[in-house]
């Protein structure tokens, strides 16, 4: 992230059974010491029949616009879990104004030769004229996080023939992912889609 972006931290784990639901989340910022403490709560519903299975959860916590520097990330009440977040100096005075695709799903797949590729799924918004399509996908892999920017363009005429609003497109990776990685996809309206994948 740059110092004119809305930064985000992602909390993930597993509930012991399906009786739990994600509750509220938030953060506390100690700017003087460059420390961000995040937290997320869980709601337990014991008055119903719950499947006795591990239930994964993922909670994105928006931190707002942070000043340049490297922050220590802590999790409230879990002192042994820490991470770092580097906020770079912005290269332009305004935030990125790309028109991102409304991605609703992302996955990493392997072909028969073991080569990895990224698949993005979603539905384009309707327009009064022409159509929207993904023009390019930029990816930055750093510290087990693959930041994905699916940039759309507005087209018309022949480019919109046989147009489908739903998309399921695959893109090659410049380098393979290993172990557990977070897919952080920038999407339309300033939001993000996040998913953890485990690759052996």
Give the predicted meaning of each segment.
Residues 1-200:
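Exposed, flexible binding/inhibitory loops of compact, secreted disulfide-stabilized domains
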């Amino acid at each position: 992230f740059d110092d004119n972006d809305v930064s985000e931290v992602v909390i993930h784990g597993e509930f012991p059974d399906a009786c739990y639901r994600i509750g509220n989340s938030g953060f506390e910022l100690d700017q003087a010491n460059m420390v961000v403490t995040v937290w997320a709560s869980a709601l337990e519903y014991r008055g119903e029949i719950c499947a006795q299975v591990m239930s994964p959860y993922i909670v994105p916590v928006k931190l707002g616009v942070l000043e340049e520097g490297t922050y220590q990330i802590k999790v409230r009440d879990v002192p042994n879990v820490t991470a770092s977040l580097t906020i770079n100096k912005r290269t332009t005075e305004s935030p990125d104004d790309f028109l991102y695709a409304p991605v609703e799903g992302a996955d990493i797949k392997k072909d028969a030769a073991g080569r990895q590729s990224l698949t993005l799924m979603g539905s384009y918004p309707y327009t009064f004229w022409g159509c929207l399509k993904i023009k390019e996908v930029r990816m930055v892999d750093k510290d087990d996080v693959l930041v994905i920017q699916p940039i759309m363009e507005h087209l018309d005429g022949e480019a919109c023939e046989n147009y489908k609003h739903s998309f399921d497109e695959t893109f090659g990776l410049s380098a393979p992912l290993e172990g557990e990685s977070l897919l952080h996809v920038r999407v339309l309206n300033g939001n993000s889609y996040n998913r953890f994948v485990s690759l052996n």
